[in-house]
Amino acid sequence: MATSAAARFLAALAGAAVLLVLLGGAAGAVVGHDDDAAAARRTMEEFAGFPASDYRGDGGGGSGGSSPFYVDSDGLQRQIDELASFSDSPVPSVTRVLYSDKDVQARRYIKGIMNQLGLSIREDAVGNIFGRWEGSEAGLGAVATGSHVDAIPFSGKYDGVVGVLGALEAIRMLKRSGFQPKRSLEVIMFTSEEPTRFGISCLGSRLMAGSEELARSLKETVDNQNVSFFDAADSAGYKMHPEELHNVFLKKDDYFAFVELHIEQGPILEKEGIKIGVVTAIAAPASIKVEFEGNGGHAGAVLMPARNDAGLAAAELALAVEKHVLESGSIDTVGTVGILQLHPGAINSIPSKSHVEIDVRDIDEKRRNNVIEKVHQSAIEISKNRGVLLSEFKIINQDPPALSDKSVISAMEFAAKQLNLEYKLMISRAYHDSLFMARISPMGMIFIPCYKGYSHKPEEYASPEDMANGVKVLALAMARLSLQ
């Protein structure tokens, strides 16, 4: 055996041994005991034919150490930067909207990395992308991970992207270490987690979870340029018949577990100096659209007692949302009036129409729905008191919250402990594809800190160290789940 070949062979064995020790021998061995490490080392030397100390590796990405079980942080950051270049807005912002040219370029980039890793790649009718590493028992439900790469206008380059590129780096780590999965491992790039183009959050994962309602509504869905969903998909290379949407639906036994790596999008981990967040539940939002109609008129000629102001009705409802949310008595209940539009929108014209969009979230579905009902009653009362017409009060979506599965939480906690990383059990208050994957698979999420909790803005940032920690926890958790 040539020296270089022997070194590579030993490197793989060393990585497998390190992973074996971290995983507890995959058969109940006590993790971290000197006897286990020594036994693994002796096995490596026996197979390689020369002492393990002969191997020296650079660790990759500046991480150091002789084990192939490392994160190539430099390579991961480079990929994040390259993916960010596929944007319809100037640096440092990222804008990547569903089925746009930049979205298509990003998809090609992700598939290119999957191909380099030797994953088998498939795409469904709406463009969810799957890269699978076949396990030794491929008939078993797979262990999946992944996230999204679409980006709202003028946002940052880490939201979702860390969960896709980081997942691919986790697969690369496991392959490099010599790990052999029992259950197949799969990385998913979900289509349109953001609602930017068609007003539908988590479009791809929602369909994967079997949403008949969404499949029906997409037949009539258009964007703000009156381009239909199917025409937009066709322009990106996804030509389909409406009935093909049912082919996107997955069965509950397709996946044994799903784990998503994501930046926190909040300040808690950074503020408390904790490296890993283990998500126990995802708060589900309800979206509401409200419209009032009044008489309008000239801002100077119509006296105050004679006015039926649709704008003031909207303003009063916005305050009512805040009031009812605070009355819930729970810190986990939040409400946001994210859109308030007035017509005709002139400084010297009394608004004749107002349009309000409201987001209410909670991990307790009953409590959240109670807030929504109170907001509805307030809208009715405001309409009567102000003499305006409540022309629409429509609940756009009202998704149930999701709890992380105990088995996935256990795997994530195990991984963090083995890596000596402090972790915190926490709730996700942001929407994620995991919310819908929980309908078809045991689910869990790994959070890493992000700078000042910033997200959906150009200042969004996660450090290489924090990303590496998240990737390592993901890799170990997936490996453990794969062997079950």
Curated annotation (Swiss-Prot):
Residues of the signal peptide: 1-28
GO molecular function: hydrolase activity, acting on carbon-nitrogen (but not peptide) bonds, in linear amidines; manganese ion binding; ureidoglycolate hydrolase activity
Binding residue positions for Mn(2+) 1: H148, D159, H262
Cofactor(s) the protein needs: Mn(2+); Ni(2+); Co(2+)
Main location: endoplasmic reticulum
Catalytic reactions of this protein: (S)-ureidoglycolate + H2O + 2 H(+) = glyoxylate + 2 NH4(+) + CO2
Recorded metabolic or biological pathway in which this protein acts: Nitrogen metabolism; (S)-allantoin degradation; glyoxylate from (S)-ureidoglycolate: step 1/1
Gene Ontology CC terms: endoplasmic reticulum
Superkingdom of source: Eukaryota
Full protein name: Ureidoglycolate hydrolase
Species per Swiss-Prot/TrEMBL record: Oryza sativa subsp. japonica (Rice)
Gene: UAH
